[in-house]
């Protein structure tokens, strides 16, 4: 684009600044009251009516003892305590302080029984402060929800969430570390019936506010469920616009037919486990060709019309150096990747009993992520380009306003706590691959504040659309935008995202066709959203985050916050045990064993080939050996083996000391040639010699969890 056009756009920016002054003054005159939409029994909130939890530091919050909770949960699982105790008592709860010390934000807490605990929340206080100050406030309080939100202090109290997660099965075809659910290791199968799946989806749309959500089918591995495709189709039938699967991609890589069938059923996204570039970077997952599997899954799914969201669990010392590689992969393939989700590790499931040494070494926060992306990619200023995920709720409020009181559904709204998740957007030219952070050419902080004023005035659809347009234009810098990006491209992007004007950009509904998919993909500009979602564990648990969770789990016992289900008090273990389908032995007798890829086993694929652009230096890079060099265990299995070896060594040393005591203190003679006679070891009360096995067979001591 010529400089002349950029200067013309700059003139339009100045014109928008002047028009905004007039618009804002008119808006101040008798603003309209909020309406109560069909999808809620409470009116839309003005920006100044939104509640906020205590923020800043030092502050006190409610947390959990990392030792009390597993002890109490075990009593419930063993039948010694009823699970109702979780509804009526503050089980395992203790106070915690969030403080600043030595340039870090920490959570510190003390249990009268188990002592002191602390963990890092952020390595950058300025970044942490920026996120909390950018939080716009909580969504409408949840209502008409008594049937599903009934979990004591773990109850979700605000909003509707943005991703309804349903675990179809706890069976998996991998044996990962880490794993939220400890798949394939709990001794039983928990797999939803078709009636249970339909009931959960039907119940979910009774809660108010009735907002659009992404329904995510998870597991285990959801594609192992016989009802996977039916569940996708039924979700679309009851009205959800976005249906996704959280998958390791193995079945999608093996079968193009499955990809096509999933797309036809209405699957829109696959949240694809994706821990790095190259097989070495994925070696901690113990599948021999896992990166090749990911590439084939991306190829097959995109070809079928399903969009892919690579999801990376980041662990310090395991794959933290891969953050930049993964972003470069997305930048190199803008026609196939439009969303990245990074998830700093949560020590739960297989890792709940983690040692302090490994926890401190592997802990990775959202602040680590923001700084790693800047260091590894040269992208993003932490306190300028990153915002809490909930920052986008102001834009959802605007969309609720323009769609009016008769809308059947509210907009998807990410109203989570500012400590939960962050996001940054890049605008990428699909043709030239030039990119820039959206916040480099659009002052998003000012846009959000302007938009809040538009929302508070509530002037109706078209005046609100004009107000949003002026807010965008007056805060736009054309000279910082990608070369060929225009103001009109920006306005079109917002219109496409929120369906503001009703223009057809290609349907996203359940009856969408391949033509609709191609139409939406024809946009020259890829709005690459990079998200970081940090799920809690027992060491950093904060009930203020749980109360406004945006990722509820649908279960046989109602809807439960993601963190309360997987970590927190651990509702997952309790509910799956309560509603277990069969013991493993019984399941294997009736259904046989499903194939599991572990121990370096490779996945066989009938179709091999893709058109993805790869950086071969990244592909061929070695695995991260940081923890090996430090002598620290990398996962729970290694910790168990080390603990066993330490015990064996300790037992041997104790036996040696006992022998020395008998020799030098008691005056006993040592056995000749180191051979201990039967008389020396037989019980004193038994004069008969015990029979001796002349041909003993070696036995390997099992490790718990093998």
Outline where the language-model segments fall:
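C-terminal target-recognition/interaction regions appended to catalytic cores
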Residues: 494-653, 676-678
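N-terminal [4Fe-4S]-dependent radical SAM core
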Residues: 35-165
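A short acidic, helix-capping loop that chelates divalent metal ions and anchors anionic groups
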Residues: 185-187, 278-284, 350-353
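Iron-sulfur (Fe-S) cluster-binding segments and ferredoxin-like electron-carrier domains
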Residues: 72-77, 118-123, 181-191, 566-576
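Radical SAM/AdoMet-radical enzyme domain recognition
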Residues: 198-216, 225-344
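Radical SAM enzyme [4Fe-4S]-AdoMet core and its adjacent flexible, acidic
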Residues: 3-6, 10, 14, 20-33, ...
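Conserved alpha-helical substructure of the radical SAM core
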Residues: 118, 122, 132-257, 261
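Local cysteine-cluster metal-coordination motifs and their immediate loop/turn environment
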Residues: 63-69, 112-113, 171-182, 564
């Amino acid at each position: 684009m010529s400089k002349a056009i950029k200067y013309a756009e700059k003139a339009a920016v100045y014109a928008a600044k002047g028009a905004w002054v007039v618009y804002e003054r008119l808006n101040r005159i008798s603003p309209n009251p909020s309406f109560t939409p069909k999808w809620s029994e409470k009116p839309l909130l003005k920006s100044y009516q939104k509640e906020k939890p205590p923020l800043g530091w030092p502050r006190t919050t409610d947390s959990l003892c990392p030792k009390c909770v597993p002890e109490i949960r075990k009593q419930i699982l063993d039948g010694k305590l009823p699970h109702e105790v979780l509804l009526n008592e503050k089980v395992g709860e203790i106070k915690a302080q969030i403080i600043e010390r030595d340039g870090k934000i920490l959570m510190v807490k003390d249990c009268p029984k188990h002592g002191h605990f602390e963990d890092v929340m952020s390595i950058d206080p300025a970044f942490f402060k920026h996120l909390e100050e950018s939080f716009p406030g909580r969504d409408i309080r949840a209502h008409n929800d008594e049937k599903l939100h009934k979990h004591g202090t773990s109850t979700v109290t605000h909003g509707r969430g943005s991703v309804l997660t349903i675990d179809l099965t706890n069976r998996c075809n991998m044996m990962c570390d880490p794993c939220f659910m400890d798949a394939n290791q709990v001794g039983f199968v928990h797999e939803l019936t078709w009636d249970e799946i339909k009931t959960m989806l039907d119940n979910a749309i009774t809660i108010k506010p009735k907002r659009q959500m992404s329904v995510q089918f998870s597991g285990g591995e959801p594609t192992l469920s016989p009802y996977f495709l039916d569940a996708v189709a039924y979700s679309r039938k009851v009205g959800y616009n976005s249906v996704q699967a959280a998958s390791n991609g193995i079945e999608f890589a093996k079968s193009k037919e499955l990809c096509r069938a999933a797309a036809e059923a209405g699957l829109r996204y696959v949240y694809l486990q994706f821990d790095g570039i190259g097989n070495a970077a994925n070696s901690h997952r113990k599948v021999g060709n896992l990166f090749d599997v990911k590439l084939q899954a991306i190829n097959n799914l995109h070809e079928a019309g399903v969009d892919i969201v690579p999801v990376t669990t980041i662990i310090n010392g395991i794959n933290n150096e891969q953050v930049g590689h993964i972003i470069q992969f997305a930048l190199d393939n803008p026609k196939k990747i439009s969303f990245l989700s990074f998830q700093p590790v949560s020590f739960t499931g297989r890792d709940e009993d983690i040692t302090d040494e490994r926890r401190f070494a592997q802990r990775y926060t959202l602040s680590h992520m923001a700084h790693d992306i800047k260091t590894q990619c040269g992208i993003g200023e932490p306190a300028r380009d990153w915002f809490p995920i909930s920052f986008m709720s102001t834009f959802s409020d605007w969309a609720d306003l323009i769609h009016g009181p008769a809308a059947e559904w509210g907009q998807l709204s990410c109203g989570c706590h500012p400590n939960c998740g962050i996001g940054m957007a890049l605008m990428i030219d699909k043709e030239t691959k030039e990119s820039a952070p959206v916040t480099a050419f659009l002052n998003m902080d000012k846009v959000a504040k302007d938009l809040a004023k538009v929302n508070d005035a509530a002037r109706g659809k078209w005046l609100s659309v004009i107000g949003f347009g002026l807010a965008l234009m007056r805060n736009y810098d054309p000279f910082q935008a990608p070369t060929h990006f225009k103001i009109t491209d920006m306005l079109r992007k917002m219109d496409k995202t929120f369906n503001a004007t009703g223009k057809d950009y290609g349907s996203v509904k359940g009856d969408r066709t391949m033509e609709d998919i191609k139409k939406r993909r024809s946009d020259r500009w890829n709005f690459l959203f990079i998200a970081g979602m940090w799920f809690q564990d027992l060491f950093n648990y904060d009930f203020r985050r749980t109360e406004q969770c945006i990722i509820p789990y649908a279960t046989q016992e109602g809807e439960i916050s993601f963190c309360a289900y997987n970590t927190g008090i651990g509702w997952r273990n309790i509910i799956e045990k309560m509603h277990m389908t069969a013991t493993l032995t019984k399941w294997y007798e009736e259904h046989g064993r499903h194939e599991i890829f572990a121990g370096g086993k490779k996945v066989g694929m009938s179709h091999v080939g893709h058109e993805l652009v790869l950086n071969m230096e990244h592909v061929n890079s070695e695995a991260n050996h940081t923890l090996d060099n430090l002598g620290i265990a990398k996962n729970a299995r290694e910790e168990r083996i080390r603990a066993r070896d330490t015990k064996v060594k300790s037992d041997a040393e104790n036996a040696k000391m006992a022998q020395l005591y008998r020799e030098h203190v008691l005056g006993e003679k040592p056995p000749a040639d180191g051979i201990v006679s039967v008389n020396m070891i037989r019980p004193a009360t038994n004069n008969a010699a015990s029979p001796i096995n002349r041909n003993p067979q070696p036995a390997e001591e099992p490790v718990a969890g093998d």
